[in-house]
Amino acid sequence: DTMLASQVCWAGYDSLQRADKATKNFWKTKTPEQSLKALAERHLGISLSKEFQASNWGADTLSPEQKVYAAKDVKVLLPLHEILMELLQKNNLEHIAELEFTALPSVIEMELTGLPLDTQACRSLMEQKKTQAQVLLQKLQAEAQKAGFEARRKKGTKYSPLLNPASSQDVLVFLQAQGYDISSTGEAALKELAFNGCSWAGDLLQYRKTSKQANDFLEKWLLKLSPIDNRLHGQYFQLSTRAGRFSSREPNIQQVPKRGEEGLAIRRLFRAPPGKKLVKADLSGIELRIMARLSQDKTMIEAFQAGQDLHKLTASKISGLPIEQITKAQRQGAKAVNFLLIYGGQPELLQKRAKETYGVDMSLEEAKEAHRKFFQTYPEVAAFHEKQRTLKRLPKNHYLHNYEKGFYSRQAVTTQTISGRKRIWGQREYGYTLASINQLYNSPSQGTGADLLKAIMGEVYSSLPDEVKMIGSVHDELILEAPEALAQDMASLLLGIMRRVGS
């Protein structure tokens, strides 16, 4: 697959280009295109017309123009194959490309088979979410009106004095009038306000989330159901994220909430038809095991080898209590500590995320103490972070190709997964790079997780009997659909492959 091979070679590379007409941001990032048309132009200097791409290819007889179009597409494949194979070899990425190629059949099967959706339950949950959103909307508008807010009149629109929560201007004007010093109505700014006691901002965030679940998830799913088999047939993209992870669209299954009762209620809408069962397995918690491997932290490795609960161990080290005395609440707080600090989170962010994501109240002093004791307990994680930071000063040669220069190398900041997948950032003038510190921390871990999932998918697919289908990948979870009589065997097969590949 030329697109996958090229995406592996370019490995997330962006270029900075001057935006001459910009009034604020004078530089913009540009990501190289990886379509067959773009590859032919970049590597061969050949311009492929796509005029007949959407023409009727199911006709009994193809037109002469269609035949020429198809022939030109085929003509560029062999020379592109030779160039891309050499590019993979020069960058030592052949095995990563092979990993992607092996996973591809399972991705095709997921798209073709689709996800079975309980339409009645989906419609019921959608109506419930819309009702919740309407209640929140009325509350937001009533509080704004009580505080004296009155919307500005706009030409060409029907006037309402009520605040429109979808209008950034309305929200900004109202909050500033209440004395809040903000310049953005984005999620981060609103979370900051809610964290500091602004209940209206918290209600607005909940309204946005509930509306999105009702309209962008549930309602769109019902509209996207195939009239042929009543299933959701999304598009999966193996390498659309720079770390090598999956994404999807039409619908975006990857946006299904991962945590909490709300996420569970939505995921339960995927139900097997009569006579079938869904078999699921995930790589939950794999980030900590990956970090143990990347950092070679002795305490982490020994804990995993001994079968210890790392969240309880962290809670024990922070609190000074024996592991057996750790409470459920303390373990929950340690989850926030573990999952945030392995990616370089600071105490201020830890305090906020503990509350937002895990429902744990933590003072700033407690967050600072947890931060100190975490890195005291896992010193090699701190050493790994320091090593990653130095990468910004140590760009390496990465090979690229175009038809004008042929093969050439460019200095680039590079991170690698355990498997050897690269993510690169171009090195700019004065040492500036597009890589942020947190990206240098989390790209190797997230990319390794993606490598594991794809290796598992490829092996599982080749091991499945014909009557069992791989139907989905949501976050780090794989979903199979099997006849009831085979479900237990498939669960054992899936678990065995995941353990073997993960080891």
Regions found by a protein language model. Give the residues of each.
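Active-site-proximal helix-loop-helix substrate-binding element of RNase H-like nuclease domains
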Residues: D1-Q89, A97-E100, Q308, K312-S319
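Active-site palm subdomain of RNA-directed nucleic acid polymerases
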Residues: L88-E98, L452-L478
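Short hydrophobic/aromatic beta-strand micro-patches
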Residues: I479-P483
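Short, conserved charged micro-motifs
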Residues: A485-S492
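Conserved pre-motif C helix in the palm subdomain of viral-like polymerases
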Residues: K72-P79, N438-Y461
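Metal-dependent catalytic core segments for phosphate chemistry
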Residues: K280, E287-G320, T417-T433
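A common structural junction motif
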Residues: G496-S503
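Conserved "right-hand" nucleotidyltransferase catalytic core of DNA-directed polymerases
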Residues: F26, E65, V74-E262, R271, ...
